[in-house]
Each structure stands twice: as structure tokens, then as C-alpha cells.
């Protein structure tokens, strides 16, 4: 009787081993589930970034507002007879490069 119980206990352990530690076991499934969740989160972040970039591309293609804004903030350009005022944070290092307006020399009178 004792031998039968030991054999049955050994069989139960052998049957449980692949369930917990095998190729398709619970631990592997749990790990893969966490990998799927992480990949979905990263995909959602990338989709949001792509939507933002797509919106910016459409704005650059269809309107002049975005081009003018980039010219002002990134290149320091302004339109003729326009005054552009930008308030900078004194604690933040500026990456803005100011380009002075061209010097127009008065025409000579003949």
C-alpha cells in the first residue's frame, strides 16, 4: 500500500513539473503575458508619437503658419515690418540663435 502511494505521489509530481516549469507552463505563460503588455504599452506610445508627427507634417504641407512659426523660433526670422517679441526663461539655457536684420544702406542721391 505504501509503495502504491509513493508511486502515485511520484506520478503527480511528474505530471505537475511540465505544467509549472515546462515549455508551455504557467511561469512561461505569465512571462509572455508581461512581455505582451509591455509591447502594447510601447506600441501605444509610438502610435501617439506617430499621430503627433503626422499632424505636424500635414500642418507643414497645408499651411504656412507652421513654417512661419518654425522660422521664428528656430531660425530667428521675422517678416518685413514685423516686431517679434519672445520672452525667455532666465533659468533655462537658450538654444535660440538671433540673427540680426540686414543692414540697409541708404541710396545715394545723384
From Swiss-Prot:
Gene Ontology annotations for the cellular component aspect, listed alphabetically: cell division site; cell septum; plasma membrane
Topological domain spans for side Periplasmic: 22-110
Keywords in alphabetical order: Cell cycle, Cell division, Cell inner membrane, Cell membrane, Coiled coil, Membrane, Transmembrane, Transmembrane helix
Coiled-coil residue windows: 31-64
HAMAP family (alphabetical): FtsB
Taxonomic placement: Bacteria, Pseudomonadati, Pseudomonadota, Betaproteobacteria, Burkholderiales
Function: Essential cell division protein. May link together the upstream cell division proteins, which are predominantly cytoplasmic, with the downstream cell division proteins, which are predominantly periplasmic.
Protein family per UniProt: Belongs to the FtsB family.
Membrane-spanning residues: 4-21
GO biological process: FtsZ-dependent cytokinesis
Entry-linked NCBIfam families: PRK00888.1 (NF002058)
Family annotation (Pfam families): DivIC
UniProt topological domain (Cytoplasmic) ranges: 1-3
Topology term for the membrane: Single-pass type II membrane protein
Localization, UniProt: Cell inner membrane
Matching PANTHER family: CELL DIVISION PROTEIN FTSB
Subunit details: Part of a complex composed of FtsB, FtsL and FtsQ.
Keyword Cell membrane attributed: yes
InterPro entries (UniProt xref): Cell_div_FtsB, FtsL/DivIC
Protein name: Cell division protein FtsB
Disulphide-bridged cysteine pairs: none
Keyword Membrane: yes
